[in-house]
Amino acid sequence: MDPTDLSFSPDEINKLIETGLNTVEYFTSQQVTGTSSLGKNTIPPGVTGLLTNAAEAKIQESTNHQKGSVGGGAKPKKPRPKIAIVPADDKTVPGKPIPNPLLGLDSTPSTQTVLDLSGKTLPSGSYKGVKLAKFGKENLMTRFIEEPRENPIATSSPIDFKRGAGIPAGSIEGSTQSDGWEMKSRSLSGAIHPVLQSPLQQGDLNALVTSVQSLALNVNEILNTVRNLDSRMNQLETKVDRILSSQSLIQTIKNDIVGLKAGMATLEGMITTVKIMDPGVPSNVTVEDVRKTLSNHAVVVPESFNDSFLTQSEDVISLDELARPTATSVKKIVRKVPPQKDLTGLKITLEQLAKDCISKPKMREEYLLKINQASSEAQLIDLKKAIIRSAI
């Protein structure tokens, strides 16, 4: 049997409406606190207009009560609001969504009849069958949640709600999420205006919930890797700081090297000057041969002199006791032979000099042989000069 074919008597309709109004008045009579505000952000969409009006009426009633208590007057009883009832329509399509009967608003145009609850007479007409009545009552019991319920409360035994009375256990199920009605509130006072949508766009990257569990196992490894990288970066920064701090020392070393090069150049110049000033003996000519080549000339010796350099048959003019020049016959000069000196130290010195200054092995061996065969100091001196010239 189709439930839409059933009809209700005026008494049953009045009883249903009375039950719904008692429910609404019960919720609107509760004390409004900061956490249970009736703003638009806490009221489910679709019933904002009704609850806002109820909140405003509650505030007005509280204000009138305070004024009446001060003046000592009795509080007048507020008449119940009028509810719009939509007449039954025989052309109802099965499966069509049924609007909320408390709002009195329908997206499709229809005629409405005003029901005055203060009177006892009821106009003709009924809700759209028992399905509409069940829908309205379920919305009242679940705080106007539009999600369909699998086990609705039986209409044969309605619960008697009273103002200020406690709610029996199990009479109201837990609230669930509601998509709300796409309908704006007609009341602008006493309600929070709707919040504008943020212009920020959400990112296109999405994360799958199924991969979270597997990826969570890698979090510790990733964190350890990041910590290791951080420590290595700190070590690198420390090493770079040390290198930068030693840059000044490197510059000092470079300056010292430049100074050493300048000193070496100075020494080379001085050595070259010494070589120029000491040309050495051009040949092996003895002093006696040099004296023979010189012309005869007078030599004045004012003091006592050594006649070892004089030769035989040469006239010498000398001064007598009165400082008069007189000719002096010179006896035959016997050249004095100086005592033999120890040449071992000088030979060792010349051998070391030949090893250090002469790079050619053959020439070095010749000089070493001559040094060992030398028997006089003069020969060793000549070898010394020859070694120095060969080194240059």
UniProtKB/Swiss-Prot annotation:
Q: Which residues form a coiled coil?
A: 219-246
Which parts of this chain are annotated as the region Disordered?
61-107, 152-182
Family annotation (Pfam families): Paramyx_P_V_C, Soyouz_module
Note down the stretches annotated as region Multimerization.
217-280
Query: Per UniProt, which keywords does this protein have?
Result: Coiled coil, Phosphoprotein, Viral RNA replication
Q: Give the family per the record.
A: Belongs to the rubulavirus/avulavirus P protein family.
Q: How does it assemble?
A: Homotetramer. Interacts (via multimerization domain) with polymerase L; this interaction forms the polymerase L-P complex. Interacts (via N-terminus) with N0 (via Ncore); this interaction allows P to chaperon N0 to avoid N polymerization before encapsidation. Interacts (via C-terminus) with N-RNA template; this interaction positions the polymerase on the template for both transcription and replication.
Per the entry, what this protein does is: Essential cofactor of the RNA polymerase L that plays a central role in the transcription and replication by forming the polymerase complex with RNA polymerase L and recruiting L to the genomic N-RNA template for RNA synthesis. Also plays a central role in the encapsidation of nascent RNA chains by forming the encapsidation complex with the nucleocapsid protein N (N-P complex). Acts as a chaperone for newly synthesized free N protein, so-called N0, allowing encapsidation of nascent RNA chains during replication.
Task: Let me see what the UniProt entry remarks about domains.
Answer: The N-terminus consists of a long intrinsically disordered tail. The central part contains the coiled-coil multimerization domain (PMD). Forms a four-stranded coiled coil structure. The C-terminus constitutes the alpha-helical domain that binds to the nucleocapsid (N-RNA complex).
**What protein name is recorded for this chain?**
Phosphoprotein
What's the source species for this entry?
Answer: Parainfluenza virus 5 (strain W3)
The gene designation is P/V
